[in-house]
Regions:
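Cytosolic, long alpha-helical scaffolding segments
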Residues: 1-120
């Protein structure tokens, strides 16, 4: 994600910048699922409490990095359109996801799919 954002910024590539927000959304979903799975491991004793702090901190940091990358990409897109209402832009993107956004999100979801726990 960082490479995608840096490349989009350095190359002033809005197509690449538009691919950052779908990845940020997926990272949030994956982090929530990983936190849920971790709680299950804590409850059944397969993971210790101390490990949980480091794991949770790692996931929180990943979400923060994703949010920062999203902010850079959104600023690029907003600057290009001569509008600079980042929160309004993100709200509209998240509620009115176009076909390109959904396709990009689906591609990322396939690429970064978590293992199915029911088969283990």
């Amino acid at each position: 994600m960082v490479d995608l954002t840096v490349d989009a910024f350095c190359e002033d590539n809005l197509e690449m910048a538009a691919k950052v927000e779908p990845l940020r959304e997926l990272i949030g979903i994956l982090c929530n699922e990983l936190k849920t799975r971790h709680i299950g491991r804590l409850q059944d004793g397969t993971c210790e409490f101390q490990q949980g702090f480091a794991f949770n901190d790692l996931l929180t940091n990943l979400e923060r990095i994703a949010a920062h990358c999203s902010n850079v990409a959104v600023a690029m897109i907003e600057t290009d359109s001569d509008e600079f209402d980042t929160h309004e832009y993100l709200k509209s993107v998240r509620h009115m996801k176009d076909a390109a956004y959904l396709k990009c999100f689906d591609n990322y979801a396939q690429k970064y799919k978590l293992a199915d726990l029911s088969s283990q």
